[in-house]
Amino acid sequence: MEPGSSVARSKRASRIAACTALVLSAGMLLAAPASADAPAPAPAGAAAQSTAELGGQPTLSLPKRAAKKKSGASGVAGAQSPSSVVPAEPRGDLDGDGAGDMLYRGLDGGTYAVTATSDSHPYTIDSDDPYETPKDIITPGDLDGDGKAEVLTLSASGTLSLHPSGGADGTGRVTWSGNGWQKYNKVSAPGDLDGDGRGDLLARTPSGDVYVYISTGDVTGAPFEAGVKVGYGWNVYDQIVGANDVNGDGLGDIIARTPAGDVYFYAGTGDAAKPFKARVKAGYGWDIYNQLISFDDLDGDGLGDIVARKPGGALYTYLSKGDGTFAARVEGGTGWNAAALFAGAGGNPHWGKQELEARTEGGSLYWYQSRNNENFFPRQLDSSDTGWNQVSLSLASSLDNDGWGDLLQVYNGTLYVGAEEIGTGWQVYNSLTGPGDLSGDGKGDVLARDTNGDLYLYQGNGLGTKFAAKVKVGYGYDTYNKIVGAGDLSGDGLADVVARAKDGTLYLYKGTGDAAKPLSARTEIGTGYNIYTHFAAPGDLDGDGKADLIGVDGAGDVYRYSSTGTGEIKKRAKIGYGWDIYNGLY
């Protein structure tokens, strides 16, 4: 089955059905003339559904692997002699054949693997909660010397869990978990940084500080030593790729990219206290890619290579030359926008919402999922129950652990999250926004604005069942006619908020991760946005891990505004039309 199957989608659909029944049981009379929402042509602008994401496999064409050598760096200036070292072992060898494999999360939330002997197939991460969607998946390699590569999962709330390998089809049960990792916006597996033959971890904070976690060889008690700060200023990069051994010295290396597309090589030193040499520029123009990925050595020469993906889903392979630079790219496959997340990808992982809900004038709800290629899939009917016009709606970035948006519904002053009744008195608010985690605990939160313009933070409990007592975090927000957010626009990994003033000026409020003051001072990012009847935050539309925005004008034309990852947005691109049949977009 393709990465687009129905397990997670079925869960979402049942939530909508459940919440519909709940609201009905609360006394809501939804009987309406059938003509109130007569079937209308589906809004256009999206391609038909015969796509790689919904049936059939993405194509993959990687270099043919040669017999493994001691090193492929012979004859390259600055590279190691082939007789001096044995190349680093692959970190993502799922099936034990000595070669790195591909592990990724599909657009349905399921995990999939590709090995040398098997095309894309379901890969089961053994978890107590089958509906939990990890925020990131990391392959550090064989940490205990048993010949099998371990797999790490990182939850949105900051729990890093270690799974022993279960072969090409899945992992074993968790042997260790550690909390507090939500303080980092990127956790990477660069390979062996201290020369002991085991893979280590690199973690970056939103402010750009870098920490190294050295592996201990104990996969049950304490698999990593305490983190040690080894650098700062790494927030200049929007992609940090743990590349394993790029130059043939057996040590882990890093490939890092700036938002402008410049690529830098950090060679490992073998010294855990100072693990990298000074950076060397290795390329430019790489901003055409939305993800840089490492699958270890692709061609069998013992050197770590890079795979790059374009927004349309095309893959390109860059084979290492042994000195931190790469040979000319080679086409590597198509349709890989089907991967919402690659293990080994360089971007900050986006999690929580890649979708929209749209409400028709007759009160039906339609669901639009991000296609991960700058567009949406064709709409799907979420609820044909008429009468949703009597409910105040907002689609919040995930408030539980499944990674899907949660529908906030206020009816007669009572707030429901999906099928869960939260409480009464919510009629005092005229805007609810769920941009993600604003308090720094990794759990989705909600911002509520009252009729006086005061802004309140409701911290989520990570289950979507309860909020902490409200905290006032701002005032004067009645100057805005739209407040939206679904992830990070500024590149620091923290959830941000965008507000549109009544005169059409657009402002960005960067998230701080501090519950007491969750938003920084506003910055203007555009004008003229009052041309849009609807303005919404669907999350990441183009696969780069950064939150994007859309606007629908009075004619029903749909425009995407992709984030640059620097607190600005790109020029608009038209992606659809006919959306004037909707009176609400969330």
Question: For each predicted feature, which ranges?
Answer:
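Trp/Gly-enriched beta-strand/coil motifs that build multi-repeat beta-propeller-like domains
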Residues: 2-4, 8-586
